Amino acid sequence: MATANSIIVLDDDDENEAAAQPGPSHPLPSTASPEAEAPSSSEPHGARGSSSSGGKKCYKLENEKLFQEFLELCKTQTADHPEVVPFLCNRQQRAHSLFLASAEFCNILSRVLSRAQSRPFKLYVYINELCTVLKGHSAKKKLNLAPVATTSNEPSGNNPPTHLSLDPTNAENTASQAPRTRGSRRQIQRLEQLLALYVAEIRRLQERELDLSELDDPDSTYLQEARLKRKLIRLFGRLCELKDCSSLTGRVIKQRIPYRGTRYPKVNRRIERLINKPGPDTFPDYGDVLRAVKKAAARHSLGLPRQQLQLMAQDAFRNVGIRLQEQRHLDLIYNFGCHLTNDYRPGVDPALSYPVLARRLRENRILALIRLDQVISFYAMLQDGGEEGKKKKRRARLHGPSSHSANPPEPSLDSGEGPIGMASQGCPSASRAETDDEDDEESDEEEEEEEEEEEEEATDFEEEEDLEQMQEGQEDDEEEEEEEEAAGKDGDGSPMSSPQISTEKNLEPGKQISRSSGEQQNKVSPLLLSEEPLAPSSIDAESNGEQPEELTLEEESPVSQLFELEIEALPLDTPSFVEMDISFFRKQSEEPFTTVLENGAGMVSSTSFNGGVSPHNWGDSGPPCKKSRKEKKQTGSGPLGNSYVERQRSVHEKNGKKICTLPSPPSPLASLAPVADSSTRVDSPSHGLVTSSLCNPSPAQLSQTPQSQPPRPSTYKTSVATQCDPEEIIVLSDSD
């Protein structure tokens, strides 16, 4: 029990001495207790405890004395800032009691005090250093509970019954704490020895010269030094854990950067947490700062617009970048070099005495800045190019399906269908980007069509001028043809031949034909059914410039001749391409009489293609009907208007019989094919007008001449030469 009491008294004395604050009355009982209890303790543990308590007591008193001297110096030097001394006292009170009574703190105080006395202008630097050390060894809140419990039991230390009641618990606590402290001391000593060994090895490696041949060697001196420094840092962190102190050494790069750049404390706190985030030393970019600002605004419902958030993030990124650059620059200045450069002083710089060296250093600095800018700009361009490439790939991925769906041929624009309508019907869930692209494509197509129409109008105007010149030059040929036809007839006095001869002459406007529409239809239909295409040999003969063979109608009745003459005298205002061929000679408003197909186009026999007859002026005819240029172009660009080449028809009589020369179309269906309706025509560039290299005008070109030539009310004259090849005209004129 005595040993237990002595152990308890010694432990209480040690704890009281460790937790005691500097004062005149408190050290008296603590100093008296070990003197009274020391003889009674005969065990080695008690003797070692008394010696350790005496050492702690000595360091504690000396540390208090040095700290008071430092405070007095601060009072005299920092009269303008009276808050410095209370701040130091507060830091000293928060520090751990074991550290305050240690030799380490004594060495730090003596060094700081001596430097502050020798260099008073750097007093705040040494104050900051001392505050950093005290903060690193500050006691935790959970550790403050033990001293409070012991101090609360101090008044009961004089009463023996209370000591007897607390003996078992205190004995167990001291028995469990004693081996733990001894084990931690061994670990601390071993780690300190390893640290000293690493420091000596690092110094030895720093003193060695680095050869250029060792740069590629994995075991070169600078790589070994870097590995040892990493191990040294890990050992130092482990040592701080065992000593229960902070690992902050006051390095500039490890200091926390406060940020107050915006008006919103929540945003400032989020940015400060970002730049002071533990872990790898990464420099935040603009995207990181912008995300932090957006998160803070969304979490705290700041209600800031997007533009203001972007401006705030830009300002914060600039300020943070400047602060981090300054921090890294100062850290490089403070930690650059090694123990070999510790003796360097600014006044002994060799560049001050050697101007060549100073100039070379300035040139190297300028070159370094230029190369740094080049590297930064190079990788900035790579980053921009990568972002642009990603955007293009994303656009291609989004617009890929839309381009494939737009491949089918476009329907007619007149019928209300187009690329937009098809896209909306085929894929109703198309995105806005796809519709925008389709709108752009449609606008481009419309512009192309307008340009093509303008070009066609220009070419049509030129062709009209050529046609006028060609018509003037062919008037003589026209007169010769009329004379040949008149001479070829033997003056037959039958009633059927007189209308045929009269139609080739100039007709008076007052003449009329008293035929009903029903009779005309019955007369036209047999002739249409009896029409047959020619043999291919006639086509070859025509291509070689020879006169085509004549088909002799041996058994032609007078009724059929009358049918033929009446068909030739019909007005040429049909919706087919015949009206487009001869419309510049005459235009009438009366609807012609031809067989009507399903699509509304007129089917006309091959005899109506010939222009050898001048049409009559009907009695009930109205003013001439004019069509617009666009409608004529659409009608003239149909399959018949582009493919059919009209031939001259000559009527002769041989041996008292009428001989009829029929045209030879390129295909049997050319004269019977219906004309496409203008409302269903595809208005695309592929259906443009086809012009010939010869002087043979196309039907669409001939259809536009009446716009510049007003209709003649009196006499109409048909020119056969304008509806055939110039070569054939020459052949026919030479046949006489």
UniProtKB/Swiss-Prot annotation:
Residue span of region Interaction with histone H3.3: 183-417
Sequence ranges of Acidic residues compositional bias: 435-485, 547-557
Start and end residues of each stretch annotated as Necessary for interaction with USP7: 347-566
Keywords of this entry: Acetylation, Apoptosis, Centromere, Chaperone, Chromatin regulator, Chromosome, Coiled coil, Cytoplasm, Isopeptide bond, Nucleus, Phosphoprotein, Repressor, Transcription, Transcription regulation, Ubl conjugation
Coiled coil (residue ranges): 180-216, 430-490
InterPro entries according to UniProt: DAXX_histone-bd (IPR046378), DAXX_histone-bd_sf (IPR046426), Daxx_N (IPR031333), Daxx_N_sf (IPR038298)
Subcellular location(s) of the protein: Cytoplasm; Nucleus, Nucleoplasm; Nucleus, PML body; Nucleus, Nucleolus
Sample GO molecular function, one term: transcription coactivator activity
Gene3D superfamilies recorded: 1.20.58.2170, Daxx helical bundle domain
Post-translational modification: Sumoylated with SUMO1 on multiple lysine residues.
Origin superkingdom: Eukaryota
Region span, Disordered: 1-55, 148-185, 387-558, 602-736
Crosslinked positions (Glycyl lysine isopeptide (Lys-Gly) (interchain with G-Cter in SUMO1)): K626, K627
Any GO CC annotation of this UniProt entry: nucleus
Pfam families recorded: Daxx (PF03344), DAXX_hist_bd (PF20920)
Keyword field contains ATP-binding: no
Interaction with SPOP: annotated span: 622-736
Entry comment, domain topic: The Sumo interaction motif mediates Sumo binding, and is required both for sumoylation and binding to sumoylated targets.
Function: Transcription corepressor known to repress transcriptional potential of several sumoylated transcription factors. Down-regulates basal and activated transcription. Its transcription repressor activity is modulated by recruiting it to subnuclear compartments like the nucleolus or PML/POD/ND10 nuclear bodies through interactions with MCSR1 and PML, respectively. Seems to regulate transcription in PML/POD/ND10 nuclear bodies together with PML and may influence TNFRSF6-dependent apoptosis thereby. Inhibits transcriptional activation of PAX3 and ETS1 through direct protein-protein interactions.
Family to which this protein belongs: Belongs to the DAXX family.
Complex and partners: Homomultimer. Interacts (via C-terminus) with TNFRSF6 (via death domain). Interacts with PAX5, SLC2A4/GLUT4, MAP3K5, TGFBR2, phosphorylated dimeric HSPB1/HSP27, CENPC, ETS1, sumoylated PML, UBE2I, MCRS1 and TP53. Interacts (via N-terminus) with HIPK2 and HIPK3. Interacts with HIPK1, which induces translocation from PML/POD/ND10 nuclear bodies to chromatin and enhances association with HDAC1. Interacts (non-phosphorylated) with PAX3, PAX7, DEK, HDAC1, HDAC2, HDAC3, acetylated histone H4 and histones H2A, H2B, H3, H3.3 and H4.
Protein name, UniProt field: Death domain-associated protein 6
